Amino acid sequence: MTQFIRKDFQVDEPDKTAVIRHDAPAPRPWEPSGILYLIGLPGSGKSAVAAGLARELGCPARTLPLDDPDAALEHIFADGPAVVEVPYKLLLGEVFRQRLQSTGRVLYLMASVEAMAQRLATTPEEQEKARERLGRLRTAYEPLIMQTLQLMAPADAPLDEVLADVLERVRM
């Protein structure tokens, strides 16, 4: 059995009180916008998962363009809830990463280099080149991704398993 530590704290300001409500859910920063951002490297399954999530959640799937993503975000906000695929190159800007975090939930689809290479290439030679390129991308972008994410889901499994896992995480 777990033993809880109980301490008596003397408050210097006895007129101040805190009210903890159990009848109302705690506010969550992403609820007003209803935006779920999917981030990950090429081949992690962002497009496929975005389409599946959009279908399951009853909202559109969008992809941010590399040119003028801020304007695209404004249109997305105006349209309401959406699942938004974010190209990894957009994560270079710190202000943009902060904007993602403050306007929705950011979910990282974390796939192995091997799985991403298999999805992107059709021949063994292409897979080797893809593995090398993806390894370099992971080294460069994963620190930025880790600074940005709020949720993370493994993405090596088949699409239906990844989608089920992501849905469970999103609905928490």
Locate predicted features.
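Conserved substrate/cofactor phosphate-moiety recognition/catalytic segment
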Residues: 41, 46-82
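Hydrophobic anchor at the beta1->P-loop junction of P-loop NTPases
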Residues: 38
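Conserved phosphate-donor/acceptor-positioning beta-strand/loop module used by diverse small-molecule
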Residues: 100-123
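An amphipathic alpha-helix signature
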Residues: 47, 113-121, 131, 163, ...
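Extreme N-terminal, non-catalytic leader segments
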Residues: 1-34
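Structural recognition of the conserved hydrophobic beta-strand(s) that form the central parallel beta-sheet
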Residues: 83-87
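Short glycine-rich anion-binding loops that position phosphate/pyrophosphate groups of nucleotides
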Residues: 88-91, 112-114, 158
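Small-molecule kinase domains that catalyze NTP-dependent phosphoryl transfer to phosphate-bearing small molecules
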Residues: 126-165
